[in-house]
């Protein structure tokens, strides 16, 4: 596992919406291998607070308030599926707008320090990690992590077999 296609979908922040979203995939036998859901409003509130604390807020308060009001209605889903092409088709037909991005997927040892090792290798190579998400089970030897990085090609050269 190295280059993976990640799907990004803005999902309405409403009861039952995730069930509707996953039902469309289930009906067409598309399996979700990894997923991250981020509340858009919480992210923007945190950014607003940090910008205020550092004195680096670049827009007036009413600008942020307008964006916060709009973002309160959505969450962002990032996910990896077993068939990204089919998932895009299914979700598009269900009325969702889907963005596809290439990301790096690594199967890592599920032990303390491995994420530190990987992030250090990427940093030492001058590669920025925009975000990552992943998971492993305590009784499993492996964990799957997804990385969105500034230089995918260079990152893949560090981990050509998809393992650190």
Q: Model-derived features: where do they sit?
A:
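Structural preference for solvent-exposed beta-strand-turn elements
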Residues: 1-164
